[in-house]
Design a protein with these regions (language model features):
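Non-catalytic pre-domain segments flanking phosphatase-related domains
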Residues: 1-7, 26-29, 33, 206
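Mg2+-dependent phosphoryl-transfer enzymes with acidic/Ser/Thr/Gly-rich catalytic loops
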Residues: 1-4, 21, 185-268
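Active-site phosphate-binding/coordination module
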Residues: 22-122
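Hydrophobic packing residues within well-ordered alpha-helices of enzyme cores
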Residues: 24, 49-53, 162, 166, ...
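Short active-site oxyanion
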Residues: 35-39, 63, 149, 209-210, ...
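Short, structured coil segments at secondary-structure junctions
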Residues: 61, 69, 170-172, 226-227, ...
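Conserved acidic, metal-coordinating active-site core of Asp-based
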Residues: 98, 102-214, 218, 223, ...
């Protein structure tokens, strides 16, 4: 029995205008009112997606969000951390060494803000990520704290060849995923959205047999594979669609709502 619906945002729940459609909003609100837990799963911090949380009414004491691609499970009302997994500064040193050798712009994030390393300008992350503090500093001044991830954010034309040339030993040091055409993320090795969802399911006394997930990209792969119902958008990547329980319509054609309307017909 499905008790939780977990949703990626970009190119999944959100349309190309970065909006939740009226149809998707209506269906998810109805499920939430019927006691189904609706959980947004994102690589972003909670402040950056707060308008979507409010739009869906996910502000009850038992509402949670999976942020930082599973690195932080946070209560929407109290902001208490149910689960977190990060990296030390020393874990980032291999990546620092590589971007220095190639002069690639890099951002690193803790669980509250973005550190924009200004050694090599050109990052477009400020235009992509809203409602979060940015602090510019040189790589030499990076503080000794816990980090959620590192991000290369440059135009797809520049990023694509960089990804193709990433050394295997560097990728092996992290859970490296391309979350959007202009974003490459470097996460803790064992981190993914499925890990965050497992912590949340455990909290409620449930398991993956009670989970439905929606996604489209590489950073959704593990949660699509783990869930009893792993649903991928028609616009999703071929390798992600290959492990899906089912394929639904595109993000611009209310794919989330269309699938839920069929699956939860007796509730809606």
């Amino acid at each position: 029995m499905i008790k939780m619906v977990a949703l990626d945002l970009d190119n999944t729940l959100l349309n190309s205008n970065k909006e939740i459609s009226q149809r998707n909003e209506r269906v998810l609100k109805q499920l939430h009112q019927q006691g189904i837990k609706v959980v947004l799963c994102t690589g972003r911090p909670i402040n950056a997606i707060w308008p979507y949380i409010e739009q869906l009414g996910l502000t009850d004491p038992e509402d949670y969000t999976i942020t930082f691609n599973g690195g932080l499970v946070i209560n929407n009302e109290s902001r208490e951390h149910l689960f977190e997994l990060g990296m030390k500064k020393s874990d980032l040193l291999p990546l620092f060494s590589y971007v220095k050798s190639k002069k690639i712009p890099l951002n690193i994030l803790d669980f509250e803000r973005v550190y924009e390393l200004n050694d090599y300008p050109g990052s477009i992350y400020r235009t992509v990520l809203k409602n979060i503090e940015f602090q510019a500093l040189p790589m030499s001044d990076v503080p000794e704290i816990t980090y959620s991830k590192a991000v290369m954010a440059i135009t797809p034309e520049k990023l694509s060849p960089i990804i193709k040339e990433l050394p295997a030993e560097l990728k092996a040091h992290y859970h490296a995923v391309q979350s959007q055409p202009m974003i490459m993320e470097f996460l803790p090795k064992k981190l993914n959205k499925a890990g965050g969802l497992k912590a949340l399911l455990d909290h409620f006394g449930d398991d993956f047999s009670n989970l439905m997930t929606f996604g489209d990209a590489d950073n959704d792969l593990e949660m699509i594979k783990a869930a009893a119902q792993g649903i991928v958008m028609e616009n999703g990547l071929p390798n992600v669609k290959a492990v899906a329980t089912a394929i639904t319509d595109t993000n611009d054609n209310d794919g989330v709502a269309r699938y839920c309307e069929r699956y939860f017909a007796t509730l809606l």
